[in-house]
Amino acid sequence: MSKIAFIFPGQGAQYVGMGKDFYDAYEEAREVYRKAKEATGLDIEALCFTENDKLNITEYTQIAMLTTEVALLKVLESKGVHADVCAGLSLGEYGALAAAGVMELENLFQLIRLRGIYMQEAYPVGGAMTAVLGLDAGVIESTLKGIDGIVSIANYNCPGQIVITGEAQAVEMAATALQEAGAKRCIPL
């Protein structure tokens, strides 16, 4: 007997046009975008489907990601595809909560809108985050000590993936230094 798992991504997986094919093809997806717009007052379609500077600002990224995740989820469910288990990374945990039916969508959208706003306030424009792949935490920690400006580890996602954050210029310098120290990749978030 096979089991189905839904895994929801965290912030950093966003891109302009995400979910557009589903939005165009399925009423279930369009309904989710409408509900998110009603709950938050934001033009989620414009945020997700048109070139703009907002999509990569935490305040907007989070609601855009969650709306897209839930839209895809509702399309799959309308086709009879349901998860036996679900999980999510960071922001993706809320997509998993939606899949589990733990919260009403309106409340979930409002919660994530506020989460994005509060995180943005704690992490103002001028800051940056980067995922560092394939480098030992000890090497990252020691490398960051040599960087001018404010930069530190924000999250130990899993072995081999650590997120750094701080002043944009310091994070950029750290990413360069970490790649020189052996990181497989540094991905701005």
Indicate residue ranges for each PLM-predicted region.
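Alpha/beta catalytic cores of group-transfer enzymes, especially the acyltransferase/condensing modules
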Residues: 11-13, 40, 100-189
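Conserved functional loop/turn residues at catalytic and ligand-binding sites
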Residues: 80, 90, 182
